[in-house]
């Protein structure tokens, strides 16, 4: 890494620097995702002498068991060791946790060089959905109340393999829509829709089975003035089919990697849509 760059932990006051870096990289999304990252985790920046960011690493630790990592470097500062320094800094902060991250094809070789291995993939869809939500027999939807938080956190921990309380407690109050799927008189899934810049992000969607996930997806995606965006694990065939059937455009695929190729914990088959690929 060049000598005119220093690493430091960023705070909420650095949000304009983060947004400028995102614009430079051409990332979708906006301030809400960055605020969510600040609330639920930590952001480390590579700051240049002129005060701008040459890069940043977003680390979301979950009880020391799992951590999500995302790294971005300004195009003007690529191939100078900044990404490697940010990854090393973030991994040191993550300790012994299982660390996961997403990478597009262009970044895959770098991620493998710093010790990550592919364990899956995620597909991004976006657009204005059409059609109505499916209504599987025996399932219903209802709004979420304050008394539901404990149940949502428990469902989510089973699926993700670690408690994401800080993330969900920051996300749920700011969401455009939150719903529970019920079956047999009990909750069997939940989902969230939240505005992020010029789109409504659909996710997370966590459900015990695909039928409940599809019911949630149709409900969460309907009736927004903005286009929707959803990140779907590549092996969730019913959710992929729903996105295509709703007329959403496939924007691309990112590899899901873990440090050392370690299997990620939890009942991951219950995660049908991510918060976003860059967060968790």
PLM segments and residue spans:
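Conserved acetyl-CoA-binding loop-helix of GNAT-fold acetyltransferases
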Residues: 79-92, 113, 209-222, 241
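A short, internal acetyl-CoA/4′-phosphopantetheine-binding micro-motif in the GNAT/acyltransferase core
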Residues: 71-79, 203-212
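Conserved GNAT acetyl-CoA-binding A-motif
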Residues: 93-105, 224-234, 254
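Helix-loop element at the rim of GNAT/NAT acetyltransferase active sites that forms part
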Residues: 12-15, 20-32, 155-166, 224
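Amide-forming acyltransferase catalytic core, primarily the GNAT-like/NAT-type
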Residues: 19, 116-201
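Conserved beta-strand in the GNAT
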Residues: 45, 51-61, 65-70, 186-195, ...
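A short helix-loop-beta-strand connector motif used in the catalytic cores of GNAT acetyltransferases and
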Residues: 30, 34-55, 66-67, 121, ...
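Active-site/acyl-donor-binding loops of N-acyltransferases
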Residues: 2, 114-132, 204, 230-280
